[in-house]
């Protein structure tokens, strides 16, 4: 039974890039990775209402540069930039190095997998029917240019006693194609019945490299039937004239006109002898 690999990890260094871009020695690697995880958890809780899609962390030369991709950058910046200044101070205290914070706006949140999953979980927490939330998100994504989308919800859907999984798909979602730009996001809805998990796959088209350039579509060559090579027994390999409308070549292998088992050309001499023989000899031959 096939299982689904993580689409982002499957495409790293092919069509996707890492969310943490820095180099560290073996001694410092684990500590810096733990710092990145804590920073992401802090920003996720702090900017819960800012529609944060992803967080990019870079560490150039004893500094840190954090890029926040958000659909609502005004909420992150705050009035006159007060919130972002407080955010810089808090992050510098946690990391122990000077931190530069950049805000990038997500132009189309309707086709961002993480934002779609967060939107569905917020609706589930407000007791909206899960099918309605999923289908509405799929319609918005397809309307704004997504080539395919798949949404899966798991848990006690509608408060039923036994947990189950339901998923819907529209368009194409080629998970095995490495050049396919698959955006993947997850989220959890904490309801009174328990936790409901939501997974979203969005197919945005093919890419060339990590620059997210659309791949050039190569036209498929029309299927042409190639002529066969020479046969081992010396007969011609091309069957162009051997169809229903073609004529069979008259040779040693042609069928005889009288329907006998012998080839037509093999019994030419015997036919002449039968014609020149007297009638009595022919009758004796038939009796034998």
Curated annotation (Swiss-Prot):
Keywords: Ribonucleoprotein, Ribosomal protein, RNA-binding, rRNA-binding
Record flagged with keyword rRNA-binding: yes
PROSITE patterns the record matches: KH_TYPE_2, RIBOSOMAL_S3
Ranges of biased composition (kind: Basic and acidic residues): 219-238
GO terms of biological process kind: translation
Keyword Methyltransferase among UniProt keywords: no
Job description of the protein: Binds the lower part of the 30S subunit head. Binds mRNA in the 70S ribosome, positioning it for translation.
HAMAP family linked: Ribosomal_uS3_B
Subunit structure: Part of the 30S ribosomal subunit. Forms a tight complex with proteins S10 and S14.
Protein's name in the database: Small ribosomal subunit protein uS3
Species of provenance: Acidovorax sp. (strain JS42)
